[in-house]
Structure formats: structure tokens, C-alpha cells
A protein has these predicted regions:
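Short, strongly hydrophobic alpha-helical membrane anchors
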Residues: 1-8
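Hydrophobic alpha-helical transmembrane segments
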Residues: 63, 140-158
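Short, membrane-exposed interhelical loops at transmembrane-helix boundaries
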Residues: 127-145
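Hydrophobic alpha-helical membrane-embedded segments
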Residues: 12-34, 102-119
């Protein structure tokens, strides 16, 4: 398959993944800000303290399952779409590139739009954990950049694993 088509599919489905993940993330924060507390800067978590809402763990599980459903759904959709668009059977490398681009696209989207634009710059009131409003850590761009670097490693590892699974599924359906 032409790698230009793989890259195009990766970017398009990466943007779909990003929009859907953003909706799930915003939904989680609207339901209960504590759901996303693990992703907050350490200074904010220290001032806030332990989770205060007993429902948080259960809600976090629900939203984690939604994240996984979106991830697997979009990746499955993209691999099937790429396989249908290809005149030759997909091999590991194109599937890996496709999935890596999708996950990396979300990682970049998360850094630029969710973390730096919304969390660090716009700072809507609903993102603040009660009692931590105005803390300088809410403007810590470096904290989120480090998370982005970790996300690159996650993108590589998850793309390797998911590509192997996708290749098995594509060949079995073949």
C-alpha cells in the first residue's frame, strides 16, 4: 500500500480519535474534576489532597472504559478502512505506521489544544480542583511537555502492540 495513503489515513483517523477523546475527557471533567486528578501537576494534587468524592473511583473506571472503547473502535475502523483501500494485503509496517500516526496525532493534540491552550492558557473554571484555583502549577507548560514526551514512548509501544493484534485480525478475516 502507498505510504502516502497510510499517512493520510493516520492523520484523518488520528483527528477523529482526538476529537472523540476530547469529548470523553471534557465529559469526565464536567461530571467530576477528580476523575482526571492523576493528570494534574503534582503541586496541585498535593494542595488538593486525597480524593474527596467517594464516587470518583467508579466514575474513573467508566471513563477509562470509554477511552478504551474509543481507542479500539477508531483503530479498528481505520485498519479496516485502510485494508479495504489497499490493493495488496496490509503487512505489519503499514499497520504500525498507521496506528502510530493516529496515537501520536492525539498525543500532539493533547499537548497543544487540551494542555497548553485549554489547561494552561484559557483555564475555564471547570478544570480547577476546588481550593487550588490560581495556583502557578496550572500554567506549568513544562509539566505537560514532559507528559508529551512520555506520550511519544506510549505511542510507539501501543502502536507495536496494537499493530500485532490488528495484523492477526486482518489475516484471520482475510
Amino acid at each position: 500500500m502507498d505510504f502516502a495513503v497510510i499517512v493520510q489515513h493516520g492523520v484523518v483517523y488520528g483527528l477523529v480519535l482526538s476529537v472523540l477523546f476530547t469529548l470523553v475527557l471534557l465529559g469526565a471533567v464536567f461530571v467530576n474534576t477528580e476523575i482526571m486528578m492523576n493528570d494534574y501537576p503534582p503541586e496541585v494534587k498535593k494542595v488538593y489532597g486525597a480524593e474527596k468524592d467517594p464516587k470518583t473511583r467508579g466514575q474513573r473506571r467508566v471513563f477509562s472504559l470509554l477511552f478504551l472503547a474509543v481507542l479500539f473502535g477508531v483503530i479498528t475502523w481505520s485498519v479496516v478502512s485502510a485494508a479495504r483501500a489497499s490493493s495488496t494485503p496490509l503487512t505489519f509496517l503499514p499497520i504500525f505506521v498507521l496506528i502510530f500516526i493516529e496515537v501520536f496525532t492525539f498525543n500532539l493534540w493533547d499537548l497543544l489544544l487540551i494542555d497548553w491552550l485549554i489547561f494552561n492558557t484559557i483555564q475555564p473554571k471547570f478544570i480547577f480542583l476546588p481550593g487550588t484555583e490560581g495556583m502557578p502549577a496550572y500554567k506549568d507548560y513544562v509539566f505537560h511537555f514532559r507528559g508529551f514526551l512520555t506520550g511519544i514512548v506510549f505511542s510507539l509501544v501501543s502502536a507495536l502492540v496494537l499493530s500485532g493484534i490488528a495484523l492477526i485480525v486482518v489475516n484471520a478475516a482475510g
